[in-house]
Amino acid sequence: MKKHLQCGLTAALTLAMLLTACGQKEADANDPPPDAQAGSLYEDFFTGDVTVTANLINAGVEATTASFRAPDVYATKGVDGSDMDWTITRFALLDLDGDGADELVLAIDYSGEEEYVILTCYDGAVYANQIVYRGFLSPKADGTFEWSNGAFDNGASRARFENGVLVYDDFAAMSEGSDGNAVYTLNGESIDEAAFSAFLDEQAAKDDLAWTEFSVDAVDAALAG
């Protein structure tokens, strides 16, 4: 697990939302394309046809936690039996990992803090990865985004998924060197501050992720294309 996802501002909760009627099956020529399959699973998520388990991902260790509950999938606000309030505010569809199927990105108000939940499909199930605000900064239409763990620990990444769990692939970063000075990297190469600043300008100029105000009807319409 990347250190910018660990503890404090960068802790991540991964919810594995396993569809009760879904299972792995062999590919068939008559099967719908991956994006259509994903759309159907996302609709099942919002209609409540899911069994939900909650896992805390921290420092690379996965452990069940009873302190977190999934949102009521029939509404956008309120979680029974929990003192954590979850309100979905907006959403976007975006193929983050380039596999031909869109992820469903939800922006949420989570107990007064803005966070994100990224739904992806794997092996006939929906997986939801919850990321704090500073772990998914300035998301762009090309699937890239920035993260920050402090003044000398920040950068930009692309996402990939391992068994439904989001993993950061950093392609740019600033960190603190052994001498206390900033160290800059881009695409695996060391660069100077000026080049890193130029990269940040280029990243900022990219088209932003297009958000839509959340409602179940709006999600259904977007999934229908």
Regions found by a protein language model. Give the residues of each.
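C-terminal motif of bacterial Sec signal peptides marking the signal peptidase cleavage site
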Residues: 18-21
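Blade-edge motifs of beta-propeller repeat domains
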Residues: 32-85, 125-136
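Structural motif
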Residues: 112-117, 154-158
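Acidic, small-residue rich beta-repeat scaffolds with periodic aromatic anchors
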Residues: 24-62, 146-225
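Beta-propeller blade termini
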Residues: 87-96, 135-145
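Extracellular C-terminal loop/segment signatures of secreted glycoproteins
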Residues: 115-139, 166
